[in-house]
Swiss-Prot record:
Name recorded for this polypeptide: Glutamyl-tRNA(Gln) amidotransferase subunit A
GO CC terms in record: glutamyl-tRNA(Gln) amidotransferase complex
First-level EC class: ligase
One annotated GO biological process: translation
Keywords: ATP-binding, Ligase, Nucleotide-binding, Protein biosynthesis
UniProt source species: Chlorobaculum parvum (strain DSM 263 / NCIMB 8327) (Chlorobium vibrioforme subsp. thiosulfatophilum)
Amino acid sequence: MQFRRYEDLRSKLLSRELTCEQVISEYLQRIDSKKDDNIFTAVFHEAALERARELDAKLERGEEPGVLFGMPIAIKDNISMKGAPLSCASKILDGYESVYDATAIERMVAEDAIFVGRTNMDEFAMGSSNENSAIGPVPNPFDKTRVPGGSSGGSAAAVANDLCMVALGSDTGGSVRQPGGFCNVVGLKPTYGRISRYGLVAFASSFDQIGVLAANCDDAALVLGVIAGQDDRDATSSHHEVPDYESTMDHVSLEGLRVGVPSAFFPENLNADVAGVVKAGLKKLEDAGAELVEIELPESDYAIAAYYILVTAEASSNLARFDGARYGYRSPDSPDLSSMYVNSRTEGFGAEVKRRIMLGTYVLSAGYYDTYYKKAQQVRRVFQEKYREAFEKVDVIAGPTSPFPPFGIGDKMDNPLEMYLADVFTVPASIVGMPAVSVPVGFDSLGLPVGVHLICNFFEEGKMLGIARNLQALCQTAPSN
């Protein structure tokens, strides 16, 4: 039983050739067969099968099936789902269960989705390799000695291994797109505010956005259409109308499309294989009628510097709530309240999370606020202005998703700065808040996936996914099984 597109599965379910229970049983068996890969932090065996039976009964009663009827979906372990464990892949949330549903979860449940489990991630979404996880790393589906990317590495690996049809992730600076590129799947980060953050555990609140990982752009668009939209429980969610994404995609033509290609996305030190595969993909767009336009944008290195100042500052504030007093891990060897706070956080957080909390506290401290935090906010505004100007000349901006292919497990753990550069091409879209997607376009000389990164103007997800779908079809890539 294998379906690379949800519409194929849906037709089998609605025609009664298959039942939801049969489908979910198959997916759960696959998940169990991959348990040694650490892809899931929790598997919802009983709940998923019970939900499948409920949906089968609904169809038997002749009731209208939802948009996502019977779709097996995985959830990153930082998105709340009532009654399910929620750990953010951290020791400090050991034993915690969600007490409410995220808005995205509510909306998917209302459309008859079935959740099969929670996926592994970098602790509190801080990382680019999925190695910063309390339960261990996830191997890349194409080479088990390499990383799947991060922080949504488990979600990307789950889709690539066909353990679910779609997975939710979160994207702060590239955490959906970079693992999408590393695992040969579509990784979508929508416009900031397009999807409610209610129920998403906060890392950096002015950057965080729930995203979608899928085998193809159609399934990503379908899920986006369900979970997008304003939410009274999230003041940053946008009132911008949610369009029919699939219809918008169908009306996208490559003929005359202006594709901006910034020199900043093709530096001299870019991996040669990555550069070759990406340029070949862009050439296919050009051959199909698009116009490649050279544009100038600020160097991505400035975005990385500003990004890591701003997100660490926000993280130091957001993670102050994890203190061992109300939920999660509490240090057993604490003679007083102050010691309990210190010991619980010291023992509960991993090295990378502690590094970012300390850095964030430093840049917000007296004497350094103007030098670092204020200056980074100014850089952010410059990027926003320059990207707005760029979209007066082009329809989409394209480049590599990552400066290098999936790297070996352990290769960059001793060099945080080198690890941070994995997001050098994805961070600019996060700084400006524009939608972006990684789409599979080919493989390097070792057979490792390479993705093209597309950025569109605010709320142009439909157009962007239409371009991505055309590009994926031209390159004829398919996820690993």
